């Protein structure tokens, strides 16, 4: 289930586009829909390479087993995010399969939609011709994750974890930040996410705690690691 991502990247943008929302319960054959309402938050990607510890998350070894693994790690470091986080997002989004889907424009290992790809790719000097390249996908996903981590961290006042940032990746930065700061695990997830989106993801009736535990279990040990150093 996807319950739900060389050289220094320096991006400045007025709004972070909402990201894809998975609706298919099986990894490797994801289907995605867009949130019913857009959520935007200003953000700036990291301007220095990632300096924290990494390489021990469950998904990392699987990422490194891919032909593009080392380049994906370099992309994450250049964007200032934890390579373990990029690996965990790739695992939960597609199980590292460079695939599209039949119901939306989401594509690639990190299942980025066309609109999001076009904005970030342009700012990274990439083009539509790079859309199917997992290395280019890693650069775009890393920039997106960096922006989302910044948005969540502004709300929590602390470095965001993989689980917290994935909430923004899945539901948009506003809902993701609210979920990350919710201290009561019994709070209904519907307080922050529309009933339509929850139903599409088979999450109707879920609590915040249930959602976070499910994401963490599917993301692996990288779920609890800080996304930025």
Describe the predicted segments one by one.
Residues 41-96, 135-139, 146-156:
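Export/targeting segments at the very N-terminus of extracytoplasmic proteins
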Residues 3-73, 115, 122-123:
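N-terminal export signals and maturation junctions of secreted/periplasmic proteins
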Residues 209-229:
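A hydrophobic membrane-anchoring alpha-helix module
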Residues 100-122, 184-189:
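Short, surface-exposed glycine/acidic/tryptophan-bearing loops
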Residues 114-178:
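Alpha-helical segment that forms one wall of the substrate-binding/catalytic cleft
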Residues 81-84, 107, 162:
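Extracytoplasmic
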Residues 87-91, 109-113, 167:
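Structural recognition of the beta-strand scaffold that forms the well-ordered cores
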Residues 161-216:
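Catalytic and substrate-binding regions of cell-wall glycan-acting enzymes that process beta-1,4-linked
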């Amino acid at each position: 289930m996807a319950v739900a991502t060389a050289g220094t990247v320096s991006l400045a943008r007025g709004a972070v586009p909402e990201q894809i929302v998975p609706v298919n319960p099986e990894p490797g054959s994801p289907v995605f829909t867009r949130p019913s309402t857009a959520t935007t938050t200003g953000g700036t990607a990291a301007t220095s390479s990632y300096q924290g510890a990494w390489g021990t998350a469950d998904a990392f070894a699987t990422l490194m087993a891919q032909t593009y693994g080392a380049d994906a790690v370099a992309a994450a470091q250049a964007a200032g995010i934890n390579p373990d986080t990029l690996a965990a997002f790739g695992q939960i989004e597609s199980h590292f399969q460079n695939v599209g889907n039949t119901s939306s424009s989401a594509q690639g290992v990190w299942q980025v939609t066309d609109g999001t790809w076009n904005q970030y790719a342009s700012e990274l000097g990439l083009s539509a011709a790079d859309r199917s390249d997992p290395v280019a996908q890693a650069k775009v996903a890393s920039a997106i994750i960096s922006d989302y981590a910044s948005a969540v961290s502004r709300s929590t006042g602390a470095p965001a974890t993989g689980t917290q940032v994935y909430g923004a990746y899945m539901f948009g930065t506003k809902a993701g930040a609210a979920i990350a700061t919710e201290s009561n695990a019994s709070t209904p997830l519907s307080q922050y996410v529309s009933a339509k989106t929850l139903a599409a993801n088979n999450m109707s009736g879920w609590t915040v705690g249930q959602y976070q535990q499910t994401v963490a279990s599917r993301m692996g040990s990288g779920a609890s690691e800080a996304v930025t150093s």
